[in-house]
Amino acid sequence: QLPNAKYLAQQPSLLSEACRQYNVGGLYKAAGRFYKAEFYYKKYDRLVLYTPAGLTSGGYGSSKGVDLYFEDRSLMRNLECNLSYSFNLSQRKYLEYTELTTPQYATRHNASLVLKYSLTKLRTIVALTERFASGRPYHNPVRSGLMNDETKPYNSLDLGFTFLATKKMIIHASATNVLCRKNEFGRIDGKPLLASSDHFFYLGVFITLGKKAAYDVSNF
């Protein structure tokens, strides 16, 4: 694909960036269970790179890892369990990264656990979500090397409630990071990058017009 327009404006001779991707995976599906695994490798060439002489297409990098997903509805009646995990090793030499290193946005471990329990008589689904990510890399000038340190891991516990008020109305409420953890999303000049708010609340009412029902009641 073409480099970002702001880089082309500075250096029109930049080449199109290239990516080669290889994937292999498999899945298993049985009564109430679904498992999936995928391994991947990506190789990047002709990335935009800052040099003393200006912008060039001499950047390169790679990304490899595995994505795992497990879904199980057979552990307990009315309970749905979803577990996902990804492992990623990513390195780039591009833009201001003058040596092959892990970019600021790349986290090595990411995982989430979602539990949904249906209260059939109350026509309500209660959801609990736990999210985790290993620390984001950042440059610590006290240490040698580039992007040589990590922030503390990301963690968030979220809650959600979905209520089928009528056959045509669904009410949904959710709250993120209910434990009010101070998560960092990187550091610049030693100062942590924080979210504008530690947690968020959401309340939505969904009404279906022109149909017999908003949702299949049997799912509640």
Please state what every model-predicted region is:
Residues A18-Y22, K29, Y60-V66, Y105-A111, ...:
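Residues that define the transmembrane beta-barrel architecture of outer-membrane proteins
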Residues Y40-K43, T56-H139, L179:
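Gram-negative outer-membrane beta-barrel transporters
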Residues A31-Y35, R77-C81, H109-A111, L122-V126, ...:
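Outer-envelope beta-barrel architecture signal
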Residues S13-V66, C81:
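Membrane-embedded beta-barrel scaffold of Gram-negative outer-membrane proteins
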Residues V24-Y28, V66-D72, L83, L113-Y117, ...:
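Residues on the lipid-exposed face of transmembrane beta-strands in outer-membrane beta-barrel proteins
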Residues A18, Y28-G32, K43, S62, ...:
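Outer-membrane beta-barrel strand-turn architecture
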Residues L75, F132-H139, F161-F220:
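C-terminal beta-signal and adjacent terminal beta-strands/loops
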Residues P3-Q10, F39, L47-G54, N88, ...:
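Outer-membrane beta-barrel translocator domains and adjoining extracellular loop/strand segments
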